[in-house]
A protein has these predicted regions:
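Short beta-strand elements of ligand-binding domains
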Residues: 108-111, 136-142
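Small/aliphatic-rich secondary-structure junction motif
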Residues: 1-52, 151-166
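Glycine-rich, Arg-bearing micro-motifs that act as flexible, cationic patches
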Residues: 109-128
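General small-molecule cofactor/ligand-binding pocket signal
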Residues: 33-35, 84-88, 138
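Structural beta-alpha unit
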Residues: 73-107
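Local beta-strand N-terminus motif with an aromatic residue
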Residues: 1, 104-105, 135, 149
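A short acidic, glycine-rich active-site loop
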Residues: 53-67
Length: 166
């Protein structure tokens, strides 16, 4: 496990997921990628600086997200870990596309219920990520997380295409 993806929208459960990812990364000397999706009213990437000023709320939202990502990055780097941060417009890439592109070995995400926080970020929910991810996924909910884990459930349908988790 050398590359961990942590999608976040900076909620409490996503913060718990980030903390767990840092603990796992320390254990396995892994790199962490923190990923945040943001909804913008226009195609922000193609917008020039002068036109950006027409959207002060979006500028504020992007600035806040960048500051939160920097804080997560600092937390990981203070533990001696390599870390990268990514921020995309909602339509730019899906979480699973990002994970595939960067060949993540693991995804750790927060969830606040059956819909999950990721639905608010990218239009997909945690269940979709768990079902469609090609790598193991840990979903952090409201309960207290005690690491290291005492037990882990590995779910499989035992079909031929199932591969080793690690």
């Amino acid at each position: 496990m050398k590359n961990i993806l942590v999608p976040t929208n900076f909620t409490e459960n996503c913060q718990k997921a980030a903390e767990l990812a840092i603990e796992l990364a320390k254990l396995y000397n892994s790199e962490i990628h923190f990923l945040h999706y943001i909804k913008t009213p226009v195609d922000w990437v193609k917008l020039d600086k002068l036109k950006e000023e027409r959207y002060p709320e979006t500028l504020k939202q992007i600035g806040s997200a960048k500051a939160n990502l920097r804080e997560l990055e600092r937390s990981a780097e203070n533990q001696g870990l390599k870390c990268r941060t990514f921020q995309y417009d909602v339509d730019d890439k899906s979480i699973l596309d990002h994970s595939g592109h960067f060949q993540h070995d693991f995804i750790i995400t927060g969830s606040s219920g059956t819909k999950g926080v990721i639905r608010e970020i990218s239009g997909s929910n945690v269940e979709d990520i768990v079902r469609k991810a090609k790598v193991p996924v840990i979903v952090v909910k409201d309960e207290e997380i005690k690491f290291p884990f005492k037990s882990i459930v590995f779910v499989s349908n035992f079909e031929e295409d199932v591969t080793n988790a690690f």
